[in-house]
Regions:
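Positively charged, solvent-exposed patches that mediate nucleic-acid binding
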Residues: 1-91
């Protein structure tokens, strides 16, 4: 995915899911890196009720996330989480 990379580590059942965010220095200065992490954090917050429990997740920002409109970024993060098997089935 152009916006981000997701690394997942499965934990014991009943462990709450924890999420970390990273943005490398090649993305820009601290203000830019912090902004992209805030946007990714908000995208994950909107998905949180549907995220499975029992995982450690690291979301690493990529260059394309800097200029991407937020609705598109949120959709890309949701696609990543679904591909990684982190989303609960709706219904």
């Amino acid at each position: 995915n152009r916006a981000a990379v997701v690394h997942v580590l499965k934990q014991q059942a009943g462990t709450p899911t924890r999420v970390g965010f990273a943005a490398g220095r090649r993305l820009g200065k601290a203000v830019v890196r912090n902004r992209v992490k805030r946007r990714l954090r908000e995208a994950v917050r909107l998905l949180w009720p549907r995220v499975r429990q029992g995982y450690y997740i690291v979301v690493i920002a990529r260059q394309a996330a800097l200029d991407m409109p937020f609705p598109e970024l949120r959709q890309k993060v949701e696609e990543l989480f679904e591909r990684a098997g982190l989303m609960q089935r709706e219904g």
